Amino acid sequence: MRMKPNYRNFNIMDSQEQMDVYKTMASNGYLNFSDVYRASDSGVYGKMYHLINDYSNGKFGLANTPEAINGYLQQAEYRNTDWFDILFNNSISQNHAISMSSGTEKASYYTSLSAMSDPGWTKQSSVQRYTANINALYNISQQVSLNLIGSTSYRKQKAPGTLSSSIDVVSGEVRRDFDINPYSYALNTSRALDPNEYYVRNYAPFNILHELDNNNMDLNVVDLKFQGELKWKPFKKVELSALGAYKHSSTTQSHSITDYSNQAWAYRAMDDATMRDANPWLYTDPDVANSLPLSVLPVGGFYRETKYGMNSYDFRGTISYNDVFAEDHVINLFGGMQLTATDRSKTWFNGVGMQYDMGMLPSYEYLFFKQGKEENSQYYTVEETRSREVAFFATGTYSYKGRYTVNGTVRYEGSNKLGKSRSSRWLPTWNVSGAWNMHEEAFFEDLTPTLSNLTLRASYSLTADRGPADVTNSQAIIKSYSPYRPFTDIQETGLHIVDLENSELTYEKKHELNIGVDVGFINNRINL
C-alpha cells in the first residue's frame, strides 16, 4: 500500500505566506492589470483581473472595489490547498496467481496464470498486467529429452500526458512544454489556488484536474516468448543440446490530447491583439504580406501514437563432457556456438485535428502542414535497426583430488556492428585460471582448527566489450534530411554524412590479471 505524500515532508510555503509575497509584489507594481491580465501564466491575481473585466448577465464577475478585492484575496490567503491530497491516492495493489503441475516419468507439465492490478498513486495513473506461462518436459527416452517453454504477458497502463523535454543550448535550461506531472505540480504550485477554478497557462484556461482528464496516455505492452530445447546423451558422459528461441515485444503508446485540453486551447488562444501577437503556438504565414497570427488547430486536438517493435531469434548448440578418472581426476569440457538476430522498429505519428467528441473524426488545417514544412519538422517517423551476432565458445576444467584446479575458457565472437575487416569484426577472448586448495594437503592438518581454510588463486584474461550502442559507424553513416528552407515552394531532400567510416572499429579490449588468497580461521568463523 502506498500512502499519499504530505507537505510536512517538504519546505513549502502555505497559502498565507504565498499571498504575503503576492501582495508585496502587487504593492510594488509587479502585478499590474495590463501585465497580469494578458500573461501567458497567471494565478490568483490573473483570475481576479479576469473576473473584474468579465461582464455578463448585467454584472461584473468581481466588483472593482477595495472591499471586493480584499475579500477575494482573503479567500485565497486562507485556502491552503493540499495538492497532494487532491492529486494522489492511497492505493492498494493486488496480485493474484495460480499454478498447476502434473506429469509422469515420461512427461511433466507446469502452467501458471497471474493478474496484477494497481489503481495508481496519482490521478490518471493505473496499471493492469496479465501473464501466462507453460513449461512441458518430455523424456522421449533415457537418452533424449525435449523441453518446451512458452510465456506471454500483457500490460495496460494509463499515465498523464507528457511531451519530450527540450534543452536551451544557450542557458542549458531543461524545460518541458505542457507539463502536468502530478508530483511536480503539487510541489511547485501555489497553495493559494482553488482546485476547482480555472487559471491561465499558455494563454489558455487551465485546471489540473480537468487537464488530467483531457490529456493522458494509454500504453499497451505485449511480450511473447517461445523456447524449445532438445537434449541427447549418446554416451553416459557426453550430452548434446540444441536450443531455439523466439521473442516478440510490442509497445503502443497512445497520447490523447482532446479538444478541451489546455494544450489544444493554447493553439487557438487569441483573445485580443496583445495575446495574439505574443502566443508562440499561433502561426504567421510568411507568404502573406502583413498577415496576422492565426490558429493551425481551429478545432479538435491531437492524437499521437508511438509504436515500438522487437523480434529476436536465438539458436544455441552445445556439447558437454564430464568424467572422473580413478576417483582423483575430474574433467569437465563444454563447447558450442550461438547465433542471435534482433530486429527493432519504431514508428511515430502525429494526428492533428482529432475531434474526440465527434466520433474521432479528423479535421485538419492545411496550414499546420505548411508550418511544419517551414519549420522543418516531421509529423511521422519510421526507424529500423538490425543486429546480428555469432559466437563460438569452449571451456575446460581439470581438478586433481580437489587440491589443484585449472580452468580455461575461449570465446570467438563477431557482430555486424563492428568493422568489416576480419580482425575488427571478430575477436577471440580467453581466460586462464588456477587454484591451489592448500587445506586439502596432508600437512595442513597440523594447522587446524586455527587455520581452517587456505586457497591460492590466480587468473589472467582478455575480455572485450562492443562499446556504446549508439556507436555504429563501422561503415559510413549517411542519413537523409530536409534542409531548412523558409518557403514551401523551395523544399528539397538532401543527404549528409553523420559519421565517417571506421572499418577498424572493433571491441574495447581489456587484459586483466587477478591474484588472490582466501583464508579461513577457527572453523571458518572468520574469513578473509
Predicted features along the sequence, with ranges:
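A short beta-to-alpha transition loop/helix N-cap that caps and shapes the active-site region
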Residues: K4-N9, R155-K158, R466
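Low-complexity intrinsically disordered tracts that form flexible linkers/tails across taxa
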Residues: Q157-V174
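The feature captures the catalytic groove of carbohydrate-active enzymes
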Residues: P195-Y198, W265
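Residues embedded in well-ordered regular secondary structure
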Residues: M1-Q124, T162-S164, D213
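GHKL/Bergerat-fold ATPase module in large chromosome/replication-associated machines
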Residues: A186-S190
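Conserved, non-catalytic sequence blocks in retroelement Pol enzymes and Pol-derived host proteins
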Residues: D179
